[in-house]
Structure formats: C-alpha cells, structure tokens
Design a protein with these regions (language model features):
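Membrane transport/envelope proteins' first extracytoplasmic loop
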Residues: 2, 6, 11-19, 23-280, ...
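Alpha-helical transmembrane segments, especially those used as permease/efflux helices
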Residues: 11-18, 266-269, 365, 369-381, ...
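Small-residue-rich transmembrane alpha-helices
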Residues: 290, 323-354, 366-391, 422-434, ...
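Short cytosolic juxtamembrane segments of multi-pass membrane proteins
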Residues: 391-407, 834-845
Length: 845
C-alpha cells in the first residue's frame, strides 16, 4: 500500500502542483511573519542594550506611558555625589528630546513615521551592552552651530561632514542650521532601526531642551572592573534623593524593549491572521484536488479493496500522499518565507522601521511551525475525501462517475446550517464584547466569521442549485448547445463546483467587508467633521506628534486671526485612553454641549469629561477623577460633563497649566484658528508662519477631512493587498479544478470532438464553466461581505462610526472582475482540452 501510494503520487505530479502551491503560499506567510517578528525582537533587544549604561539613574515618571519623555529631570548635583561612590568608574549625564527632525537636501523630513527623531547630547560613555554608538568619522560637536548625525540619517539626507544641516526642534528656536562635524555609528554592527539621531554638545542640548537648566533626563553610571550591575545599583541607591531611582542597565534595556515590542506585536498578529486566511482558502483547493483525484482513481482503489486492502489502508495511502505533499509544500514555503521576510523588511523600511543592519533571525520555532502547519493542514484537508472514498464499495467504485448522493448533500446542508448558526452566535457575542472591551472579543469575532464561511461552504451544494440552474438556462439561451453543456457540467457535480467557488467566496467576502468598513469609516469621518468642526483652520503635525508652542504665538499675531485654541494630548496614561488639555479661557470656542455642570467652573485643578465616559465610570459633577501622571497619582474634580465630540477625542480634559504641572512637556498637538469676520486670504498668512517647517500644516475643513480619510485608505489598501494572496489561491483552485475535470472527462471530450464540436467551441464551453464557478463564488462572497460589513458597523455605531455606507460601485467591480477571473482561469485547461487527440481521448478509460 505504501509503494502504491508513492507511485500514485509520482504519477500525478503535475496535477498536484497547484495544490502544493497553495500550501507553499500559506506556509510562506507563516514563516515570513515569524522570521520578521524574531528579527524585529532581536534588533530592538540589541538596540536597547546599546543605549543604557551599567546603571541608569532616572527620575521616577521620567517617561510617559506612551514612551515619550516627561519634564522630570535629574539635577546635576546628583552626578557630583555619584562620582565619589566606591565602584564607580565614571558618571555621565544624558539630555534627550523627541521631535528633532533632520531636513534633507530635497527639503523633506527624514523619518518621522514610526521610529522617533531623537536629539541628544554627545558623550563617549560606554554602553552596558558593549556595542554603543561611537564617532566613526569627524569630531564631537561643540557649540550651537555644530552637530553630529548617525551615519544612516546623514546618508538618507544626503549630507557629508562640513555641510549645513537644517533642523527642526520641538522647543526653543523652531529651526536651526548647524554644521555637520561628525558621524556616529556602530563599529561592531548594529542599527537604530530607522530612528534618527542628532547630537549636540551638553550645554547646547540643555539650552535647547531644558531651557538652559543644569539638569539631565537620565544619568549613566559606569562600573569599575569586577563590580556587577546589581552591586553598583545598590551602592548608588542610598545617595539618591526622593523621586530619583536607580536601575541596572539590563533592567532598563529589557523594560524599554518589552514596551516597544508589545506595542509592535500587532504586526506579527496581523500577518499571521492573513496566513491563516490563506491556509483556509488553500484547504478548499486541497480538498477539491484530492476529491477529484480519488474519484478518478476509484477503479484503482476498488481493485486494491478487491485484493484485500482494508478501508483503513485506503485512507492511510491517501494520507501518505498528503503527508508527502505537505512536507514538500512546507519546505518550499519555508524557503519562500525567508524571501517574504526580506520583503517585509524592505516594506516596513518605507514606513521608517529600518532593520537593514540586522541579519534575519531563523529560529527553531519557525521551522517547527512551518512543517506543522504545512503537513497538518494538508493531511486534515485530504482526510475528508479519503474517508469518503473508503466508504465506497469495490463494486460501486467500478462505475464511471461517482458523485455525492442527495442524502449526503442534505446531511452536509444541515451540518453547514448548524455551523453557520454557531458562527452567528459567536459573532454576536464578539461584537457585543468588543464594544465593552471584553477580552477575547476579537477571537470570538474571527471564529464566528470562520464558522459562518465554512457553514455556507458546506451548504452551498444545495443553496447554489437555483443559481446553477439559472446559469444553465441563461447560457443555453445565449450560447446555444455549448452554453447548455457548460451549465450541465456545473450541475453534474455541484459539490465540486461549489467547493471551488467557496475558496473565491472567502477572499471576496473579507474584501467586501473591508470595503464597507473603509467606506463607512470615511463617511463617518466626513459627517463628524462637518457637524463638529469649529473655527476656520486646523494646524497639526503631519506625523501626528507635537510641535513647537511658539507657532501658536506667531499665528495669533497674523492679521485676520481672532483667536487660537491650543490642544495637547497624552495617550495611554489614563485608563489606557489618555488625557487632553486646553486653555479654560478658550473652551467656549469648542461649542461643547454641556449635559451637566458649567464650563465656567472649568479651571486649574479640575477636569471636564465626555458623557459616555462619565456614564461608564459612574461620574457626576464634583466627583474626583484619579489620573496617573509622571508626577504620580492625582485627583481632579469634574467641573462639567459634555456630549461626546470628535474634536476632543480623549475622555478627560484638563488645563494647559495642570498638564505642565503633571510633568508633561509644554508642546502643542493641534491648533484651531478662528478668523475675524471678513478676513481675506488668511490661509496665506498662516502658511507663511510654517513655510520653513515641513512637519506642520495648515488645513481648512475640506483638507482636514481629507487628511483624516487618508490613513483609512492606506489601511484598506494594505488589507486588499494581503487578501490578494487568498484570491490568487482561489484562482489557482479554479484552474486546478478545471484542469483535473478535463482529465477526468477526457473520453467525453473526445466524443464531443468526434461528433463535430470544434476546438473553439470546446474552449468556450470550458470557459463558461469557469465563469459559472467564479461568479458563484463572487455572488456568495459579496452577499456575505455585505452582511458582515453592515453587522460590524452597526455593532460599533456608538463608537463614533455612525454612518453605514455600502460602496455598491466597488462591489460591482468585484463582480465584474470575477467574470474576468473565470475567463483567465480557463485559458490553460481549455487549451489542454482543445489539443487532445480525438482517437486517444475516445480510447481513454
């Protein structure tokens, strides 16, 4: 039996090729995701190990929960005291700032998306990891007119030593033009992973980022030989004043790396989800392929049964073929996964996450996961047709054609219906939980969608009969006898037809869902901007970060400006959401609808909160709100409760003064500009203020709405690109099914040619069969996609996405493309059928 199975496999190499390709693509996505994830983890771990000293002395609350620096610092007097501690080799103070952007020769900002733009003071303190940044060319900067850059940033910007480098700073002078005097890098290999690094001398960094105070953001303490990090930390701790802490370099590096890796972990999850989709779609192709091949081998298997082979042996022989196929597919997929990981590295480099300095990490888990996924998915998919074949008696298998009985399809229908009902229940629970932020809601939604898709796929041989019958009648009317034959061939084995269509159904269902989500999100943005937009212009950072507060002062002086409203945000510090701040003197300009309390009571030391948040937390006017800020936990009483407003999208609003006292840097996130009545050409005056600041833009209502829609468009395009993998597999499934069907019907094709059917008529018949399959999959996919999209948007209608918009034009394009897919998928199978030798085909058994 083992020998027979292997010979059968070798005898059908071409037929199994596209099934293998489905496994290859799915495994490649799994392997590529894991390799990229491991490379990302290794890179950040190595990076942070090179950016800490043996012991790091820092203020408690020196970093906000979102990873930015607070305004808390370490006084220089601490350094002098630490220098005399036994076991201390040297002590170095560090000044750091986010938002120091390098402007390239082309006038564009380097970086900005993702990895930070850092400004620091230069020192040559040794890193705990032993591979810190060092000057590799030039000299250290001295004075405000000199800087050093990391090599990668200088290369991207097009600067060499001696060039003048335009800089944008978060505070102080908005723009500087120092001279590049040095380049820094990792002599032993390493990378900043896309971050940009600008280095000043210590006095200049303190002047720019700490208002000239003799203070530091943190301090590195270097140990003498033979002194461990723990021993040095213990010796240092006793001398530190309240509010200052000491941690080992290893602890600081692990903490920073863990926070960042947790923040970017969604990348791996995101990619693995699409790997799963590809494998599910590929499973349909494998099931269909093995079903056809096993049916074609029915006589062969019947003879084996007649010679004494048991049902179990027949199943095992098919499973052996699947095992070999899975191993081959996993091996090729593993190799392709390495290339995919390299491609992901290049792709994410376009968004600022540059891992080019880090070699790819090929871990053991990647190999194990790839083979487990490839082999298990293939064997599981092949088990169903193998089990079904084992139930066929030797005498029954001698017949020319074997199809599922009506009772079998009816059983499949009821099982599929039960599966779909379970999926609906899971989907309802998950969508209800996601609104209430209950754990595992995402998994519930994913499982619900999968069960519904599988349920519909199981029911499709029954529910698709009216469609297939209508297609046969339409084709017969439009294309005559060839159209009638194509329709009858689709109806001959509805299970096979619908199984092939189901692969396309899954991809298009998800694509349609995302199309509706994207279109609804954009429509909701337009509506909220139209209803809630106040003022005449919005000023913001193109990277979504902070910008110099002096810009607001300059814009307030532009002719025609009546008022400027500042907004500042801090994310993830308050219940996982964040806090914002405005000036109480300008709060009336927001035109908030107050439901309780009075905005006149909003002052330093108090907050105003959104209505939905107040209801969720059970807050009334006067109740204290406990907030975790860099200076520690504090309580602010509620002065007023207002209706939710997208202009202030964070739930708790305090004053600018309290934000600064809480330990946050005084930098603005957005400005709303109010024009005086009759002011003309105000945009030109505002643009002039930021003419030399490419990171800050001025937008009217239409431009602001467009800016809010752009991330949605980008996200949907990425989703479509990833779903394209599933659609490619689905198209391969149609090609494979048609090709195997032609082989299965070789004798029938020969008879058609013998009675006068021309080659072009034969090609047209097979093309129509392909169109039926693809259109059926598209119709089912679009219907399910509309249902998923509408239900999903309805479930989150209270989360700011109030508009449900179905892009019927886009869905129509999907249906039109399905016809094109069907015609293209039929090219090779139709060509093969047309080229069959008539006499040999008739003689085929």
């Amino acid at each position: 039996m083992w020998r027979a199975a292997l010979k059968s496999l070798l005898g059908r190499k071409v037929r199994l090729l596209m099934s293998t390709f489905a496994i290859v693509l799915g495994v490649a996505f799994v392997a590529g995701s894991l390799i990229f994830s491991d490379t990302l983890s290794r890179s950040f771990t190595a990076l942070f190990a090179s950016t800490v000293g043996d012991v790091v002395v820092r203020p408690v609350g020196g970093q906000t929960a979102s990873g930015t620096l607070s305004s808390l610092t370490v006084p220089a007097s601490v350094i002098k005291e630490l220098e005399d501690v036994p076991g201390v080799a040297r002590v170095d103070g560090n000044v750091s700032a986010f938002g120091v952007y390098v402007v390239g020769e082309d006038g564009k900002v380097i970086g900005g998306l993702g990895p930070p733009a850092l400004g620091v003071n230069y020192n040559d303190a040794p890193a705990a990891g032993g591979e810190g940044l060092e000057l590799v060319e030039g000299e250290a900067p001295s004075g405000i007119d000199e800087i050093a850059l990391d090599e990668a940033t200088a290369e991207k910007a097009g600067y060499e030593i001696g060039d003048t480098v335009p800089l944008l700073t978060p505070r102080g002078d908005s723009k500087l033009s120092p001279t590049l005097v040095g380049l820094a890098g990792f002599p032993d290999g390493g990378s900043l992973n896309g971050a940009t690094l600008t280095m000043f001398d210590t006095a200049t960094a303190q002047e720019l980022f700490l208002e000239g105070r003799d203070e530091y953001n943190d301090v590195w303490v270097t140990a003498e030989d033979g002194v461990s990090q723990e021993e040095l930390r213990d010796a240092v701790e006793d001398l530190l004043p309240d509010g200052i802490e000491a941690v080992t370099g290893d602890e600081a590096a692990d903490e920073s790396a863990s926070q960042l890796l947790e923040a970017v972990s969604f990348i791996t999850t995101f990619l693995l989800i699409f790997a799963g989709i590809a494998l599910v779609v590929g499973s349909f192709l494998i099931v269909n392929t093995f079903s056809i091949l096993v049916a074609q081998r029915s006589r062969e298997l019947a003879l084996l049964r007649a010679l004494g082979a048991s049902k179990r042996q027949v199943v095992r022989s098919v499973q052996l073929e699947a095992f070999v196929l899975g191993v081959i597919g996993a091996t090729i997929g593993l190799g392709l996964g390495v290339l995919l990981a390299m491609g992901l590295r290049v792709l994410f480099a376009q968004f600022g996450l540059d891992l080019s300095g880090q070699p790819m990490v090929f871990g053991v888990r990647t190999v194990l996961a790839s083979y487990l996924v490839g082999v298990l998915v293939t064997m599981a998919a092949a088990w169903l047709p193998a089990r079904r074949t084992a139930k066929i008696s030797p005498v029954q298998a001698m017949r020319d054609d074997i199809a599922l009985s009506e009772s079998s399809m009816t059983t499949r229908f009821w099982r599929g219906l039960a599966l779909a009902v379970v999926g609906m229940v899971l989907l309802a629970i998950g969508l209800g939980d996601i609104v209430d932020d209950v754990p595992y809601s995402g998994q519930m939604i994913g499982a619900g969608v999968l069960f519904i898709l599988l349920g519909v796929a199981a029911m499709s041989p029954v529910i698709s009969r009216p469609f297939l019958s209508a297609a046969r009648a339409l084709f017969a009317r439009l294309f005559g006898s060839m159209g009638n034959l194509a329709g009858q061939n689709s109806l001959r084995n509805p299970r096979r037809t619908t199984a092939t269509a189901s692969a396309l159904m899954i991809g298009l269902a998800l694509a349609c869902t995302m199309a509706i989500v994207g279109d609804s999100a954009k429509a909701s943005v337009d509506k909220s901007v139209e209803e809630s937009f106040v003022g005449d212009y919005v000023v913001s950072n193109v990277f979504g970060g902070e910008f110099n507060p002096s810009i607001a002062d300059q814009m307030a002086g532009v002719d025609g400006v009546e008022a400027v409203l500042r907004q500042r945000y801090q994310f993830q510090d308050f219940g996982g959401e964040g806090i914002s701040a405005i000036d109480p003197a300008t709060v009336d300009l927001l035109e908030l609808k107050v439901v309780d309390g009075d905005l006149a009571d909003f002052e330093d030391g108090s907050v105003i909160v959104q209505e939905s948040y107040a209801e969720e937390e059970g807050l009334d006017v006067g109740d204290p709100v406990e907030v975790e800020v860099p200076t520690g936990k504090t309580k602010w009483p509620v002065a007023a409760i207002y209706e939710d407003n997208p202009i202030i999208f964070l739930p708790v609003v305090t004053t600018l003064t309290m934000m600064e006292k809480a330990g946050y840097e005084p930098a603005d996130n957005a400005l709303t500009i109010f024009a005086e009545p009759g002011a003309d050409d105000l945009q030109a005056g505002l643009d002039a203020v930021v003419a030399e600041l490419p990171i800050v833009t001025v937008k009217d209502q239409a431009a602001f709405a467009k800016e809010q829609r752009e991330p949605i468009d980008q996200f949907v395009l990425i989703i479509f690109a990833l779903l394209g993998l599933a659609l490619i597999i689905a198209v391969l499934g149609i090609v494979n099914t048609l090709a195997l069907s032609v082989i299965e019907r070789t004798r029938e094709v020969g008879l058609l040619r013998a009675i006068g059917v021309s080659r072009s008529q034969l090609r047209w018949m097979i093309t129509l069969e392909s169109v039926v399959i693809s259109v059926l999959g598209a119709v089912l996919g679009v219907i399910l996609g509309i249902a998923f999209g509408v239900v999903l948007m309805y479930a989150v209608r209270d989360e700011g996405l109030e508009v449900i918009s179905v892009p019927y034009g886009q869905l129509g394009v999907f249906l039109a493309l399905s016809v094109l897919i069907g015609m293209l998928a039929a090219v090779l199978p139709a060509r093969r059928a047309a080229r069959l030798d008539v006499l040999q085909a008739i003689a085929t058994e």
